[in-house]
Amino acid sequence: MGAEALSNRTNWQMGARISGDAGERTFAAQVAPYLGAEYVVQHRPPKLKIYSEEKWIKLDTRITNTVTGLSLYIENKEGNNGGNAHERVYKFLSPALKRVVRETFNTVENPFFLVFSGRTFQGQKYKDEINLLCEGENYAIMTSDYENIQEVANQIMEIV
């Protein structure tokens, strides 16, 4: 594809970014009312500086239990047109990354909770992959209209 064709094609990444940002905000707003008064939900918490040379990871939401002082970080992947956005969350399954975040940022034992939302993740292929690769981890696949938000909030309160 030539330079002109490339510059004139649809920028699918921008659409995906808008959809992803909306999904992050939606989850934080949807879960907050179902958590107890002792929970603080922070959308776009500070970056976690864990690598050398001021490199960091950035998660979508932090939920803190003000009684225990412990936090849980949420990474939300919103998908509405297929694709592989969900594959980028698998780094959060790394035992070493979990250990560093837990030791540095006052979190629960498993500091990450992965959320998959949007039309894409209603498909059986995606559900099967996520259920297999995230087995034993903190995660939820949101139903199309967040009908399972109470269940997910309960799951989060059991963790943190």
Where are the language model's segments positioned?
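Active-site metal-binding core of divalent-cation-utilizing nuclease and nuclease-like domains
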Residues: 40-68
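Catalytic cores of nucleic-acid endonucleases
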Residues: 70-72, 76-135
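Non-catalytic C-terminal interaction segments of nucleic acid-processing enzymes
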Residues: 127-160
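Interdomain/boundary linker segments immediately adjacent to catalytic/signaling cores
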Residues: 1-49
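Hydrophobic beta-strand residues in large extracellular and virion-surface proteins
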Residues: 31, 41, 60-63, 74, ...
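Phosphate/oxyanion-binding active-site loops and adjacent basic polyanion-contact surfaces
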Residues: 19-27, 54, 84-89
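Hydrophobic, Leu/Ile/Phe/Ala-enriched alpha-helical segments that form helix-helix packing faces
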Residues: 27-35, 96-104, 130, 156, ...
